[in-house]
């Protein structure tokens, strides 16, 4: 290649390089423009997004303000004694007041206690003058408690000692006296206003164990609460839980102490607020309680009983005040089919009022002794207890007062 050819070849190379450099510049400019365009687009998009978000926040703020305004307009007007939160002077000058917690009103119940009720007879008695004969003759279950019904329906709870059985069993036990009545005799109690019966006594099994079970079944079916032995009961009386316990002492004496302790604890565990213990104890025809009666009664009070009553002597005994609680040692007979003409017809209805406030017994010293006769006929037993009046009432009250004075010396 000569020099001229070399020069031409060099010029072509320089020309190509200039041509390529120009193209590169164009490409670079295009890339730059595209980059700028993208960047500007991003800026515009970000600005639009920010504006949209600001608009949304503004709308939400307006909506919230509108809701608050509506709530303020619908809020009940405060009374003049309320504190204005925006008025610091008023707020500082007014004392904050609090509403006291409501307390439960005291609730009082009156309980009536009566003694031995034998609704039936012994098959060996003269049936012409028996309890059953009067039932058939009167043909009215309401006859027997007719003269005391107003008292029993006016109280809150009436409790009796059910001295006998209600059964159709003929399995009479070998004993001097065995009492049974027809199961329909439950109507005597329901129509008379009796709500609960103690069954822990020496006549509850007169026709065998089945007669005892029958008596429970028929009484409970009639709506009458039963208790006694190891069967305690807790009744709801006007919202007050009343625990009922029946103890049969005649055979075991002081051997019943543990049962007293256990049964009282049992009704406590069931929430009893008032506890009544009914003892079948003592000596027949005796107006003076023995040492076993006193020991068991005091134990019951010490363990938490609020009232102790007794029966079995068939006559009245005194009332002792022990640790502020009442012990009625014997209520005597009441509606008693076990004797066609008892020589001592004196009896009573013992009433006590218990007041409970905020679940606690706060008062139990209101008592009422209503002297009665177990018969409304003086010459024989017509099995219809009645309230005594006048001199007879005063005589029985005086008797109870004398018996009680000896116990409270």
Please report, for each region that a protein language model flagged, where it lies by residue:
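Acidic, metal/ion-coordinating pockets
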Residues: 2-12, 25-78, 87-409
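Acidic, low-complexity cytosolic linker/stalk segments
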Residues: 16-17
């Amino acid at each position: 290649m000569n020099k001229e050819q070399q020069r031409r070849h060099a010029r072509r190379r320089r020309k190509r390089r200039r041509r390529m450099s120009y193209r590169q510049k164009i490409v670079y400019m295009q890339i730059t423009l595209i980059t700028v365009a993208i960047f500007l687009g991003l800026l515009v998009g970000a600005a639009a997004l920010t504006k949209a978000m600001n608009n949304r926040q503004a709308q939400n703020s307006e909506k919230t303000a509108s809701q608050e305004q509506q709530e303020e307009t619908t809020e009940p007007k405060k009374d003049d004694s309320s504190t204005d939160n925006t008025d610091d002077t008023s707020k500082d000058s007014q004392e904050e007041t609090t509403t006291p917690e409501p307390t439960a009103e005291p609730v009082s119940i009156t309980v009536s206690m009566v003694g031995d009720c034998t609704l039936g007879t012994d098959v060996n008695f003269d049936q012409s003058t028996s309890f059953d004969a009067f039932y058939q003759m009167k043909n009215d279950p309401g006859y027997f408690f007719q003269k005391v019904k107003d008292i029993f329906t006016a109280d809150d709870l009436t409790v009796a000692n059910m001295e006998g059985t209600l059964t159709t069993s003929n399995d009479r036990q070998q004993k001097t006296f065995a009492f049974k009545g027809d199961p329909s005799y439950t109507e005597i109690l329901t129509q008379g206003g009796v709500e609960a019966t103690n069954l822990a006594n020496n006549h509850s099994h007169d026709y065998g164990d089945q007669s005892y079970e029958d008596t429970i079944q028929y009484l409970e079916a009639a709506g009458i609460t039963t208790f006694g032995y190891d069967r305690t009961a807790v009744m709801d009386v006007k919202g007050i839980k009343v625990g009922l316990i029946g103890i049969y002492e005649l055979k075991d004496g002081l051997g019943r102490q543990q049962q007293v302790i256990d049964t009282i604890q049992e009704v406590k565990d069931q929430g009893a607020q008032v506890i009544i213990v009914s003892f079948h104890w003592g000596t027949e025809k005796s107006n003076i309680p023995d040492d076993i009666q006193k020991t068991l009664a005091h134990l019951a009070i010490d363990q938490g009983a609020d009232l102790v009553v007794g029966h079995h002597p068939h006559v009245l005994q005194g009332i002792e005040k022990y640790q502020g609680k009442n012990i009625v040692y014997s209520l005597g007979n009441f509606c008693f089919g076990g004797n066609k003409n008892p020589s001592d017809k004196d009896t009573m209805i013992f009433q006590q009022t218990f007041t409970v406030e905020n679940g606690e017994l706060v008062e139990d010293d209101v008592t009422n002794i209503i002297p009665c006769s177990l018969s409304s006929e003086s010459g024989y037993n017509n099995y219809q207890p009645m309230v005594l009046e006048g001199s007879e009432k005063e005589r029985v009250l005086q008797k109870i007062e004398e018996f009680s004075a000896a116990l409270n010396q």
